[in-house]
């Protein structure tokens, strides 16, 4: 699936530019430290890794809103819900339907048919409640259903462990153009899946 390009605004350009300048500085320092016998370059690599993660998450947060904006107006509600779920480390899996109907791809759970709200999303994913397992489906500005079962990705990562929620998010994005939000219950980290790839994003109340 080909993604439509869009113009970056000045704020995101400046943020990314700042990160890239920091990465460039760290890389230059690393080159200098190669000839220093008493310097551990692993620390430099770790700092660069963190900077790369931060710049990717910053860019992904920006792109996320643009990927969602044509399909739902409920950015604020979703942002608040995802942020609060992340803070509490409550796992979550949210499918936002876009152009393609996803009904044929999921094992349907419990019908909800209610307007999207942060409170409703957080309640559905509260640990121990009957509907907290599985995925919520959002179509336009409506929360259609909960406890849906998604197709798992057949791709197995050899570099790191991927949990069931993340495999389901990737699997769904491999088979449709849907965008899937994921909150890890182990770390609280937030990511989204699109076109078979998983992208980390920063946690904030206005991330979307």
Model-derived features with residue positions:
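Divalent-cation
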Residues: 1-208
